[in-house]
Amino acid sequence: MPFLSDMLDQSRRQQDEEQALARENLAEASLLQAHLSHRSALRSRFRFDPAAVMDCLRAEVLGQDPALQAVEDMLKVVRADIADPRRPLFSALFLGPTGVGKTEIVRALARALHGDAEGFCRVDMNTLSQEHYAAALTGAPPGYVGAKEGTTLLEQDKLDGSPGRPGIVLFDELEKASPEVVHALLNVLDNGLLRVASGERTYHFRNTLVFMTSNLCAHEIQRYDERRQRLPWRLLPVGGERRRRDIDGMVRARLLKTFSPEFVNRLDSVVTFNWIERDVVARLVELEVQRLNRRLEKHRCRLEATPEVLAKIARAGFDRQFGARALRRSVRHHLEVPLAEHLLDHHQPGDGNCTTYLASLEHERVRFVRR
């Protein structure tokens, strides 16, 4: 019967299409399983996306490409889990003047990896400048009070990090530490361990990113740039590579005068941060406004600023010697204080909707209008 024959042919075609689709799905599933197996092998210890972490860092740290490149290279090695297991995952010394982002890059990294800008162990080396204060890091010797307690400056849980993510420790202002403390750090860089003086406890840094900061060479670099600016333009070196080589030479010479060659030689990376320039300051102002808006979320309001306001803050906040800290003072004086006064006098919580305020210049003063 023609009708039944057509139905049978249609059923066969449908069955063939379903079988072909099933074969395609099986092939795709096999490829997906192989892809996941490959990824899971790399995820056996660390589970984070280096590209996503770097996106967070580049949004927070501006004008410091060499430092960001060093951190990106480090993240790839750590994520692939091919770092030397007998040493810290990574060790770096960040050099440069104040207010250029040496500590901020560590905060941004902690925020990206652990969701908390304070999710790292920070040791202020300024408090360890005297020999008798070294016990705060290395622990009290045997027979002294607190010998079995270890150091009060390190938290092992922050050194270990969170599941699938490395820990972070920052030794701030390294040049101010006593020689005994630097010698203890030599052992940390060498084998990833810090044994307290009593021998009762050992701190492990083998799952840790070790960062150190220092203001060494800041004055030398400033004088170098000032001499360059006084030269006739015909005598100025062409390009920035010459400046980079000169500064690297100055930094290395100063490092070897301050620290032992054994210590410097065990660092994975030494990065000199750039001065904050005018073009970077303009972008930093926008970043500070974004941070202010995050703090305003709890009040259900947000801030928008005209280009004139942003330019005024950038002009007042540009100070090459003091970097971003001078900019933050400008933001506080020209934006946060007037905004706080306006909110205290005029802000009325709405019905749950977000209130937007526009900051504009009026007779060189910042005024706010509700939009």
Curated annotation (Swiss-Prot):
GO terms for molecular function: ATP binding; ATP hydrolysis activity. It comes from the Bacteria. SMART domains: AAA, ClpB_D2-small. The keyword Chaperone applies. GO terms for biological process: cellular response to heat. The keyword Hydrolase does not apply. Keywords: ATP-binding, Chaperone, Nucleotide-binding. Its cofactor is Mg(2+). One of its GO terms (cellular component) is cytoplasm. It holds the Pfam family ClpB_D2-small. SUPFAM superfamilies: P-loop containing nucleoside triphosphate hydrolases. ATP binds at G96, P97, T98, G99, V100, G101, K102, T103. Belongs to the ClpX chaperone family. Unlikely to encode a regulatory protein. Has ATPase activity. AmiB and AmiS may act jointly into a two component ABC transporter system. This is ATP-dependent protease ATP-binding subunit-like protein AmiB.
